[in-house]
């Protein structure tokens, strides 16, 4: 944020529900996408920068709510398939298949999607503005392949494979790439 502020950008930043300084105990990408949509419509940014599940949620909301005032997107460490994330949690938390299936049904009933249907690469097909997708090959949270899967379907995507930063991608190298992309006409 500070490097962009020094370049005189106006910054609007939000934390996901149940993350950082936000209230709540429930987080879903769909719930987050609604907050992102509201924020975008309130402030009308020209450039949107989103990280991790925030990037997935931004891609999802923009696929059905095209905002013509947005000129560019930057997606940092975005997951592609919710199924990959959920399988990781399934393994990490050692919950059984019936818990996974119950969660899958809950998501379908509450948000209209099964886990396997929630894919950024599918939603990204509808985003036709210049977009920078950045990922680190050794990201331990989100598979590196997600970058290529999303970019392959996004008409104006540019990818950048970071050599630093892991999943957070908070390094000077990435900051420089984001600034260079943002400043490009």
Where are these regions (language model features)?
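Conserved alpha/beta-hydrolase
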Residues: 1-21
